């Protein structure tokens, strides 16, 4: 399977992606979250029109199927054993199909790895008539894309993040406004070429076609952020099993994104090593007794810890809860210091002072929001999955924000995202009409 990496490969809303027509007509949608600790699938049914408002979309979307299995063949969000990954994907999707009593053929895939990188490029044009028209917006966007060097990395998301007209900035919809010079600032998010190919390979071997892809932290924001947070700007920090991802979202658009290979599994490994116990017992200790803030009674509260490889009455040691907390805090400080470095980078410069929302299974630890607020020097809260119709109470915690957000993305994807190979080939055959379709896309998107 080959992947196109030219800058101007963009999906248009008036062009149906191959293999997705049947599900689109029936209103059946599916999302897949390929994580390092678990692989989850959610099937939804869109009842009613794909309204423009997020609240309307949420009320019209109902979850009808769910499946989850332990991750296999995945390390740090990337495929390391395609046969094992295929098997795990099949198990999760099969469970979701059985619960929904529906067979699916295409799916939206959330991506947590691939070293996402964002850059903003600017294009300037003089308006043709003194009033901004679709061709002017198209020309400004093409100028901006002309400055982009993706270095062979496929574009995952592309957003016009800002417009300026005669040096008046902050314009969301420039069409129809009077002005001489139009500026378009375009945000581009790319991922590693081989990473995306291997994810698509594993999904394809499970007899599914990726209808589109979405960055995991961006999907989490679609689910966990409030309307005001999405509009005013917020940073999502998605703490997964092996990967922590950051996304700055403003005006419902992805402005910046990054990730690094540290997550909840590293905390579990630290506990196992520090307490000389098994991974399974370490995970249990972390889940039941882990906290990010030391309490006054932690040194007096003793925990029974089974020793690794020991049996009998002498196989249990007793340690103070405070010792467990110190193990966790040491690693949490490292994780959030990495986050702070990335938030201080030029890519996230516009996010200064905005709220941080923690998502992912790793964000459920008591006291983590307060701990993160101290390290990041920002207001922090834990975000929970949006309450879609048909979701169980178990699926509404922070560990399912990516999956539910990917389902929302499937219901109304951005008009520009990474494409499967068939759609690339179809676009390549119609390159002569590219500018005309791009103009129509801009009229709808802006």
Q: What are these language model-derived features?
A:
Residues 39, 221-222, 232, 241-247, ...:
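Short glycine/serine/threonine-rich phosphate/pyrophosphate-binding segments
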Residues 232-274:
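Glycine-rich phosphate-binding loop of actin/hexokinase-like ATP-binding domains
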């Amino acid at each position: 399977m080959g992947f196109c990496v030219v800058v101007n490969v963009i999906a248009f809303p008036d062009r149906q992606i191959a293999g997705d027509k049947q599900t689109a007509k029936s209103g059946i949608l599916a999302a897949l979250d390929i994580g390092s600790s678990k692989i989850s699938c959610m099937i939804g049914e869109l009842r009613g029109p794909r309204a423009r408002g997020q609240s309307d979309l949420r009320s019209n979307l109902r979850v009808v199927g769910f499946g989850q299995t332990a991750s296999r063949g995945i390390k740090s969000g990337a495929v390391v054993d395609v046969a094992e990954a295929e098997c795990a994907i099949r198990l999760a999707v099969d469970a979701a199909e059985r619960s929904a009593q529906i067979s699916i053929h295409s799916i939206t895939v959330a991506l947590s790895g691939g070293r996402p990188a964002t850059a903003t490029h600017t294009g300037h044009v003089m308006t043709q008539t003194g009033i901004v028209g679709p061709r002017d917006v198209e020309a400004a966007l093409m100028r901006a894309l002309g400055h982009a060097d993706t270095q062979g990395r496929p574009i995952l998301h592309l957003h016009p993040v800002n417009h300026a007209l005669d040096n008046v900035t902050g314009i969301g919809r420039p069409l129809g406004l009077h002005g001489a010079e139009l500026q378009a600032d375009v945000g581009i998010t790319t991922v590693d070429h081989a990473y995306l190919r291997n994810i698509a390979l594993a999904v394809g071997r499970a007899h599914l076609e990726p209808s589109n892809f979405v960055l995991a932290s961006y999907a989490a924001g679609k689910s966990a952020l409030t309307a005001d947070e999405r509009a005013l700007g917020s940073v999502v920090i998605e703490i997964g099993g092996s990967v922590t991802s950051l996304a700055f979202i403003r005006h419902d658009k992805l402005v910046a994104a990054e990730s690094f290979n540290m997550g909840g599994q590293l905390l579990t490994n630290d506990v196992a090593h520090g307490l000389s116990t098994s991974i399974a017992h370490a995970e249990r200790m972390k889940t039941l007794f882990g906290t990010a803030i030391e309490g006054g009674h932690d040194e007096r509260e003793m925990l029974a810890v089974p020793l690794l490889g020991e049996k009998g009455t002498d196989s249990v040691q007793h340690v103070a809860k405070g010792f467990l907390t110190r193990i966790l805090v040491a690693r949490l400080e490292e994780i959030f210091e990495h986050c702070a470095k990335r938030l201080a980078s030029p890519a996230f410069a516009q996010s200064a002072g905005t709220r941080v929302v923690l998502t992912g299974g790793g964000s459920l630890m008591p006291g983590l929001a307060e701990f993160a607020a101290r390290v990041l020097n920002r207001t922090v809260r834990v975000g929970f999955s949006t309450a879609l119709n048909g979701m169980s109470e178990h699926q509404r915690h922070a560990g399912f924000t990516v999956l539910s957000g990917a389902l929302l993305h499937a219901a109304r994807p951005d008009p520009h995202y990474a494409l499967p190979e068939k759609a690339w080939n179809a676009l390549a055959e119609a390159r002569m009409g590219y500018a005309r379709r791009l103009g129509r896309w801009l009229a709808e998107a802006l």
